[in-house]
Amino acid sequence: VEIRDSLALNPKQQVELGHQLKTQFNLGGVTILSTCNRTEFYLVNAEHKLDQIIEMLETYWNLLELRESVYTIQNLDGVRHLFRVASSLDSMVLGEPQILGQLKDTFQSFNDADLMGKLLHPLFTRAFSTAKRVRTETTVASNAVSVSYAAVELAKHIFEDLSKQTVM
């Protein structure tokens, strides 16, 4: 959690880092999703450059232990992961709606900055339409809530009267 928190980027930082990665490593496309629960890099033509990219990111964040916390998902598995993220099937609370909005905001920022390239743009567009189908054709979002809402509901089950509880 400590490392994940230190990796959080605001939208401006995401795009700046995206430009740096695309230029430095001659990538065919870059998108960086950074939320309170995840920082993910969607990169095109990066498979033979991953060690150098991770090394650059360790320097960027001044985190020499970053490599130990990074995992990569490539090719079709990476596409499936993006679709799961967009559909909120890979969220702390299954079906929560925030991640799709965050992903759309990221898409807009990176598209406006001309960083997505010819592969990521249609891939993200398809992920959004798939997410819409998941939400409308399944029950995955029927009880979707935020993490904070879920925490309050759990607290209600644990304590008889929340008004008598102190939260720090």
Model-derived segments and spans:
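Conserved class I S-adenosyl-L-methionine
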Residues: 165-168
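A glycine-rich (often HGG/GG-containing) alpha/beta subdomain
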Residues: 1-91
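Glycine/serine-rich phosphate-binding loop and adjoining beta1-alpha1 elements at the start
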Residues: 65-163
